[in-house]
């Protein structure tokens, strides 16, 4: 819970919608005031299709219940490396596309960190 609270604090004042499978960890208190739990979460875990169902349930709940311009799926390890105000200014800027990329084959640190997701 502490890592999710840390992520929510970093993203404040924006709403952080959390899908948590309480059968995996029943005691999961979050203190950040901007956290909302997805109601009736599905069972998740490795080799369980519920992980995908949990993502879709979260997206459906967000679309039905929240008012937002941008939505990003995150895990607790996705802590921002720059202030939210800087990201907000960039996203609201005049650029037509908000996309950045890293040449994984040229950046060995990036290749070791996230390369398995690409190959």
Predicted features and spans:
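ER/Golgi luminal nucleotide-sugar-dependent glycosyltransferases, focusing on the catalytic module
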Residues: 1-119
């Amino acid at each position: 819970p502490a890592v999710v609270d840390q992520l929510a604090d970093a993203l404040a004042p924006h709403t952080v919608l959390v899908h948590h499978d309480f059968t995996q960890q029943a005691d999961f208190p979050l203190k950040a005031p901007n956290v909302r739990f997805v109601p009736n979460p599905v069972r998740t875990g490795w080799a369980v299709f519920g992980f995908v169902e949990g993502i879709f349930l979260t997206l459906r709940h967000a679309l039905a219940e929240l008012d937002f311009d941008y939505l990003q799926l995150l895990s607790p390890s996705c802590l921002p490396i720059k202030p939210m105000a800087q990201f907000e200014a960039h996203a609201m800027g005049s650029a037509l596309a908000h996309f950045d990329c890293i040449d994984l084959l040229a950046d060995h640190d990036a290749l070791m960190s996230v390369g398995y997701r690409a190959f």
